């Protein structure tokens, strides 16, 4: 499943295609959304927001399309008039004069008013988004030490969207390697330096992934390109200590780590 950085890049692509352009055609597959089709024609997308793995497409008439891709949903951008060859089932079409965005295969799709945005069950449940530029390490540290989270093992906590939205398995693995901790550690057992390092890594790692993953221009990014240090690298030597990276299962997900420097 895509994690926060991939969802945010998808949102960027949707914005680049249709933001600010009048909608010339709107289509929804689900009957409960059909009545919104005519209400959105002539309106425009003001921005596309991410809340963890959910996408909020905001329209100029104050309605918001909520969508969660789950395992199979995917957004595509096409030239208007183009019909992609795919076996996926179309759920949403938002068309402008030159570009159209299409949502396939997703099942969790709703239209929300401003009031419903504040009471939506999923949006109420998720924690702060790691890609929110206003989220600081200090706030993350407060959450780590809160009664709700301080006794949780990191193996499960870093996958819990109620703690921080946008984290997933590859980020869990890479963050814990960065700070030399294991999935069995808990916030309540860390010293001040470890807590500080973890709070920063919980933001720095996903933000670096979002900003540079897939980029190759090391001059532009000063060598700080995101790449996997342990994820999918079991059997290889750890670049930090030379130990052999191992693979196990934690919280029902594959977990990669180096026993030589994560303890």
Swiss-Prot record:
DNA binds at residues 70, 125, 169. GO terms for biological process: base-excision repair. Its cofactor is Zn(2+). A zinc finger (FPG-type) spans 229-263. It catalyses: 2'-deoxyribonucleotide-(2'-deoxyribose 5'-phosphate)-2'-deoxyribonucleotide-DNA = a 3'-end 2'-deoxyribonucleotide-(2,3-dehydro-2,3-deoxyribose 5'-phosphate)-DNA + a 5'-end 5'-phospho-2'-deoxyribonucleoside-DNA + H(+). Binds 1 zinc ion per subunit. The active site is at 2 (schiff-base intermediate with dna), 3 (proton donor), 53 (proton donor), 253 (proton donor). One of its GO terms (molecular function) is damaged DNA binding. Its EC number is 3.2.2.-, 4.2.99.18. Gene3D superfamilies: 1.10.8.50, MutM-like, N-terminal (3.20.190.10). CDD domains: EcNei-like_N (cd08965). Keywords: DNA damage, DNA repair, DNA-binding, Glycosidase, Hydrolase, Lyase, Metal-binding, Multifunctional enzyme, Zinc, Zinc-finger. Belongs to the FPG family. Involved in base excision repair of DNA damaged by oxidation or by mutagenic agents. Acts as a DNA glycosylase that recognizes and removes damaged bases. Has a preference for oxidized pyrimidines, such as thymine glycol, 5,6-dihydrouracil and 5,6-dihydrothymine. Has AP (apurinic/apyrimidinic) lyase activity and introduces nicks in the DNA strand. Cleaves the DNA backbone by beta-delta elimination to generate a single-strand break at the site of the removed base with both 3'- and 5'-phosphates. This is Endonuclease 8.
């Amino acid at each position: 499943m895509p994690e926060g950085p991939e969802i945010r890049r998808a949102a960027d692509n949707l914005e680049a295609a249709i933001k600010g352009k009048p909608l010339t055609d709107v289509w929804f597959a689900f009957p409960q959304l059909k009545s919104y089709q005519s209400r959105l024609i002539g309106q425009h997308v003001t921005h596309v927001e991410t809340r963890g793995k959910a996408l909020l497409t905001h329209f100029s008439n104050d309605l918001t399309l909520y969508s969660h891709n789950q395992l199979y949903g995917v957004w595509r951008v096409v030239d208007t008039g183009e019909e992609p060859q795919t076996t996926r089932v179309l759920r949403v079409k938002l068309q402008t004069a030159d570009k159209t965005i299409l949502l396939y295969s997703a099942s969790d799709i709703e239209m929300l008013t401003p009031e419903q945005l504040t009471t939506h069950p999923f949006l109420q449940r998720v924690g702060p988004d790691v890609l929110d530029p206003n989220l600081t390490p200090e706030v993350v540290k407060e959450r780590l030490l809160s009664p709700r989270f301080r006794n949780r093992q990191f193996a499960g906590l870093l996958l819990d969207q109620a703690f921080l939205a946008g984290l997933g398995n590859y980020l869990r693995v890479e963050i814990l390697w960065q700070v030399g901790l294991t999935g069995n550690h808990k916030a309540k057992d860390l010293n001040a330096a470890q807590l500080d390092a973890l709070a920063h890594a919980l933001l720095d790692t996903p933000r670096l992934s979002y900003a540079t993953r897939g980029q190759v221009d090391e001059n532009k990014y000063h060598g700080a390109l995101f790449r996997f240090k342990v994820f999918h690298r079991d059997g290889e030597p750890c670049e930090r200590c030379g130990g052999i990276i191992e693979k196990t299962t934690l919280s029902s997900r594959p977990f990669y780590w180096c026993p030589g420097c994560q303890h």
